Curated annotation (Swiss-Prot):
Encoding gene (name): YIPF5
Classification lineage: Eukaryota, Metazoa, Chordata, Craniata, Vertebrata
Pfam families noted in UniProt: Yip1
PANTHER family to which the protein is assigned, alphabetical: GOLGI MEMBRANE PROTEIN YIP1 (PTHR21236), PROTEIN YIPF5 (PTHR21236:SF6)
GO biological process: endoplasmic reticulum to Golgi vesicle-mediated transport; insulin processing; protein transport; regulation of ER to Golgi vesicle-mediated transport; vesicle fusion with Golgi apparatus
Disulfide pairings: none
UniProt keyword annotation of Flavoprotein present: no
UniProt keyword list: Cytoplasmic vesicle, Endoplasmic reticulum, ER-Golgi transport, Golgi apparatus, Membrane, Protein transport, Transmembrane, Transmembrane helix, Transport
Membrane-protein topology: Multi-pass membrane protein
Identification of the protein by name: Protein YIPF5
Length: 257
């Protein structure tokens, strides 16, 4: 033990004191600490000047009852973003341009060739009805064993483009491509009847030829009547009916053969 005490005494320096080390390590708040010069002059009470003035206002006490809130706490009704409520917005079908009343009137105009066509309604660009009639025409051809959807759409596009160019040359007001496609599509309705007859019996006999000629005349007369009333082309119905008859004659050939 005497040797161990001598060893510990020799290990520490003569000027080193454990009491001085503990005082130097833990006395951070005193004036003699190593950090006293850096942090002693900082005033923590200065943080209050950065608080916004609105946050320092005292809150008003709630004077109402729990089950009967005052008017100040009544939530306001949300304001609409677009200025109008949802009840005032038009229906989705009207925004898409689908009007069942106009579709029905155009269909009746085609089914009654002698009926006077309304030019204001017929001048609209409505492609909902023509698309339905084109699909119905292709479906009836499919029932007859003729997969001709590509021919139907291709001939329809070429025919609409040709009639669009022709009517713009003949009329003074001009016409849009959508209006031409709409009228020609609606007048395809009698051709659906012809393709439906082809499902039941053959149209390659004399009866079929007469029926086919009547359907072609029906379609071309209805289309020319609508174009004349919509574009104010009085006295030119035969000139418009001839190219329409050529177009619907191609559809009739697809139905017969």
């Amino acid at each position: 033990m005497s040797g161990f005490e001598n060893l510990n005494t020799d290990f520490y320096q003569t000027s080193y004191s454990i009491d001085d080390q503990s005082q130097q390590s833990y006395d951070y708040g005193g004036s003699g600490g190593p950090y006293s010069k850096q942090y002693a002059g900082y005033d923590y009470s200065q943080q209050g000047r950065f608080v916004p003035p609105d946050m320092m206002q005292p809150q008003q006490p709630y004077t109402g009852q729990i089950y009967q809130p005052t008017q100040a706490y009544t939530p306001a009704s949300p304001q609409p973003f677009y200025g109008n409520s949802f009840e005032d917005e038009p229906p989705l079908l009207e925004e898409l341009g689908i009007n069942f009343d106009h579709i029905w009137q155009k269909t009746l105009t085609v089914l009654h060739p002698l009926k006077v066509a309304d030019g204001s309604i017929m001048n609209e660009t409505d492609l909902a009805g023509p698309m339905v009639f084109c699909l119905a025409f292709g479906a009836t051809l499919l029932l007859a064993g003729k997969i001709q959807f590509g021919y139907v759409y291709g001939i329809s596009a070429i025919g609409c483009l040709g009639m669009f160019c022709l009517l713009n040359l003949m009329s003074m007001t001009g016409v849009s491509f959508g209006c031409v496609a709409s009228v020609l599509g609606y007048c395809l309705l009698p051709m659906i009847l012809l393709s439906s007859f082809a499902v039941i019996f053959s149209l390659q006999g004399m009866v079929g030829i007469i029926l086919t000629a009547g359907i072609i005349g029906w379609c071309s007369f209805s289309a020319s009547k609508i174009f004349i009333s919509a574009l104010a082309m009085e006295g030119q119905q035969l000139l418009v009916a001839y190219p329409c008859a050529l177009l619907y004659g191609v559809f009739a050939l697809i139905s017969v053969f």
